[in-house]
Amino acid sequence: TFAPSLSREILRLLPGGRFELNTRLLDFHLARAGYFVEEFIRLFGPQRRPHDDITQRHRDLAASAQLVLEDTLLHVGRRLRALTQATSLCLAGGVAYNCVANGRLRAELGFDHVYVPPAAGDSGAALGAALWWTARRAKATVRVVLPDAYLGPQYDEPAYRAALSEAGLVAEYLPDDRLYERVASELANGRLVFWYQGRMEWGPRALGNRSLLADPRREDMR
């Protein structure tokens, strides 16, 4: 396991719900470009290239990073819960998309509700800025509840047919019961299925209206 090294060298927990990130070893912008300092490579091994096999070391490193992330969020959340006694928690930022960590926050810290907006990252800042400015100008007369994330465009069947024709694709039209059977069969045979219906989701997560489906039981689909 790499968790002890990550906790000691990269992400240290401090008293009072605080933490410290060692940017000398882990630079976000350099890492995105594929550059790591020698000390980081010494601790965790060489970088995996896109076409390299995924080894047990890679799996262990990913699992350890997930565990350290969860422990850090619990560390911060525990302090927040003690200070506020709040029973509801709202999260934002890219880390808020980590479903496993969110589940632990709710299960282990006593929050009754954990809310993550569908566009919790940078893209959601546009709507947040608009709402903040509206409230600041005292123009917000109604508090609108966001029932779901399906705020994007929606198209009718003539538009579907026109798009398929323009792309030179031949379509087969099936009733719902036969469609579901066909999709299940294709998934079981290791095929990818693009599921398209209704309005497009707002945010980076595919939530069933613009989704690529695959059988998670298959090793070659992971």
Give the residues covered by each predicted segment.
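Flexible beta->alpha loop and helix N-cap segments adjacent to enzyme active/binding sites
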Residues: 1-56, 78, 82, 86-88, ...
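Adenine-nucleotide phosphate-binding core of ATP-dependent small-molecule kinases
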Residues: 50-76
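Active-site glycine-centered loops adjacent to acidic/histidine catalytic or metal-binding residues
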Residues: 94
